[in-house]
Amino acid sequence: MVFETSKATSYLKDYPKKDGLSVKELIDSTNFGGLTYNDFLILPGLINFPSSAVSLETKLTKKITLKSPFVSSPMDTVTEENMAIHMALLGGIGIIHHNCTSEEQAEMVRKVKKYENGFINDPVVISPEVTVGEVKKMGEVLGFTSFPVTENGKVGGKLVGIITSRDIQFHEDNKSPVSEVMTKDLVVGKKGISLTDGNELLRSSKKGKLPIVDAEGNLVSLISRTDLQKNQDYPNASKSFHSKQLLCGAAIGTIDADRERLDKLVEAGLDVVVLDSSNGSSVFQLNMIKWIKEKYPELQVIAGNVVTREQAALLIEAGADALRIGMGSGSICITQEVMACGRPQGTAVYGVTEFANKFGVPCIADGGIGNIGHITKALALGASCVMMGGLLAGTAETPGDYFYRDGKRLKTYRGMGSIDAMQQTNTNANASTSRYFSEADKVLVAQGVSGSVVDKGSITKFVPYLYNGLQHSLQDIGIKSIDELRENVDNGEIRFEFRTASAQFEGGVHGLHSYEKRLHN
C-alpha cells in the first residue's frame, strides 16, 4: 500500500514516539554511560526564518544579561584586561585571572571599566598654569593630548577651556601656559543630559570631546568621540545599565587573603566575581559566598566548579548567583586522570543545570568547548553560557608573546593546575595553589599541563565567527533563541541521537588525501 503524499505529515502520529531521543533518554547513564559533547548530535528542525533572526541573549547570573553566551576563562594565559575589554565589546564577558597580586588584578579591572565610558566620570583634568611642554609629556605617557582645563585642575572645578592636540601641535614654546593656547569657546552638555542626547550633541558639534557641566559651569564628566565610535562598532557591547561602562568579572580564591583582594576589586568597579576552585563543594567556598553576600549584597557571585546536583545544592543554598560546571574536561586539565575525580562534561552539564534551573540559577559550561557544535550542545543541555580557555588561547588578545616553532606561530597556553602556573608567583598571590587546595604542599601535584597553541588571530574576528556560527546552528535546529532552545529541549520537542565511534568518524572529515580546514574568512 502506498500512502497519499499530501498527507505525509499526518501519518507521523502513527509512530509511538518522535524520531530520536529526548534529553532524559540521552543522558541515561545506564544505557550510554557518561557523555561528552562528541557523543551525541541534535536532530534538525524546520527552518522558516533567517539566521540573523536568532537571538543569543542569555543570563550570566541572576541579574546580569549578556548579548552573547561567551565567557573567557580566568587563566593567566587567557584573560587579562585586553581580553576582558574585547570580550565585553563583543557581547560577552572576560573573567580576569588572579595568578597575580591583588593590586595588579585590581588595576586590570580598573582598565576595563575605564576603557569605554558613556560618561567619563574621572577624566584627566589640568589647570590653566600647566605648560604646553607638560601636556606633550602627558600625551606621551597617556596616549592622548586632549584635556579639559578647570580653574583648580580637578573634576568639579569651573571649566575654562579644553586643550587639544591641534592647539599644541605647532606651538614651539613649551613654556607657554595652556591658558594661552587652549580652546575657550566650548560646546558643553548640561548635567543630567542623556547619553543619547549627549552623543547627538557631540556629533553635531563635530568636536572630539563634550564636557558635561553643572548649573555653575563646573565640570562633572566628559563624553568622548572615540567612545561614540566604539558604540557604533560594537552595538552588542556588555555594559552596566547604570554607568554604561563595560562589564568586567574577576576570579578570586577562598582563602582569607582573598577577602582583602575582593575589597580592592570592588573598589575598582568589579561587576561579578568568580570563586575559582577545582571543587566548589568546600566549606571554604560556602563561607566565602556567605561573607560576600553579607558585605556586598549586590555583587554577583559565580560559584563552582561543580559536576553533581549535590554539589550545586550546597552552593545555591549559600547564595550563589550562578554556577560553573566542569571538572577535568578542559584540554589542558588532567584532574580526571590524576585524581580519579570528575565527570564527563555533557552528563555533568545536564545533571547540574536540570537542578539549578529550577531555582533560577544560571549555569556556565566550563571546559571541553572545542568548536561551535560544542557550544550549541552545552546550551541545549541547559547551560546559559560557555566558558572558553583553549578555544580563545592563541588569539592576539591573550597575554604573552608569540614565538615560532617548526614554522608555526604559537603562543603559550597552560592549565592553572600545571606546575608552571603553580610556581608563577609567591604563595599568597598564587591562584593555582589556592584553586587546587595546594597552598601548604611541599610537593606540588599537577592537575594540568603547559603547552602551546597556533595563532588564531584576533577575537574581533574569531568571536563574531562563533556568534554567527551559533546562530546558524540554532537555525538548523529550528530555534530562534537560547530560551526557546531550553524550553523545547525540556518539553521533548528537540530530539537527540547517540553517536557510536563509527558515527563520529563519519561526521568528521574523511576519505581525503589532504585538506585545508579554514574556519572563517
UniProtKB/Swiss-Prot annotation:
Q: Where does NAD(+) bind?
A: 276-278, 326-328
Pathway(s) this gene product operates in, as recorded in its UniProt entry: Purine metabolism; XMP biosynthesis via de novo pathway; XMP from IMP: step 1/1
Q: Please state every residue range assigned to the domain named CBS.
A: 119-178, 182-238
Task: Provide the protein's localization.
Answer: Cytoplasm
Give its E.C. classification number: 1.1.1.205
| Catalytic reaction(s) noted | IMP + NAD(+) + H2O = XMP + NADH + H(+)
Any idea which positions bind IMP? 331, 366-368, 389-390, 413-417, 447
Protein name (Swiss-Prot/TrEMBL): Inosine-5'-monophosphate dehydrogenase
